Structures are given as C-alpha cells and as structure tokens.
Amino acid sequence: MLSGTSYLYGLWPPMMEAVRYLQAYASVYSLEGRIASGLRSNQEQATLYAQGRTADEIRRQVSKRIGVDVVTNAPPGRSAHNYGLAVDVEGRDQTKLIQLGAAIGFATVSGDPAHLEWPGWRSLVGL
C-alpha cells in the first residue's frame, strides 16, 4: 500500500489522478511505501534548499558540495513541487514504486531516487 494521502492536497488534478493510479497499482502488487511530499510552498522549498548549504552558496545557487547532504537542487519556484506537479515516495519498496511510477508515465530525476514528476512540467508553468 502506498499511503500518505494528505500530500495529495494541492496537486494539479491530473497529477493527483495519476498518483491515485500509482496507489492502486501499489496495492495490487503489495508494495509498501508512502508519499512523503507533494505540493510545497516557496518557503518550504527555500528551507529544503538551504539544508546543507552556506548562505553564500544559497546566494550563488550552488547545486552540490562534496561531503554535504544537500536535500534538493531546486531553489524556490524552480521545483515541480511548487506547482503540485511532483511527489516524493519513500519506504520499504521505494525503488519498485519509482520504477512502477516511471512505467505508468511519470518522469524520474537522475540523482533523486524518491522523486516522481509530471513529464514536461516546465512547459506547463512557463519555465
């Protein structure tokens, strides 16, 4: 079962429908996990973006620093989460859930093993 329905609130309606489809498939295949994140405000994204970065790195929008646990590479307004077009999945069967999500049409992001997003989302929001 793929739990975490509170994170469906605020998703773009077609995205929400696709996540419910993923949940149904997860149930059929007895996959365990949860939606750990969905829609994020710019403030929530800024907080996550700041984790693992110095103030100078945030100003310069440094994406990675070796040996530091950076949570996201997307500053506020540049994440699919800010538009209700992404979810993060975690749990025992995370890898299988991400593979299943990709098989039913979600886009995945290299280097972010928990992330599923609406394919082509940037064109929907004008980025």
Q: Which sequence ranges carry the predicted segments?
A:
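Cell-envelope/glycan interface and biosynthesis
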Residues: 1-127
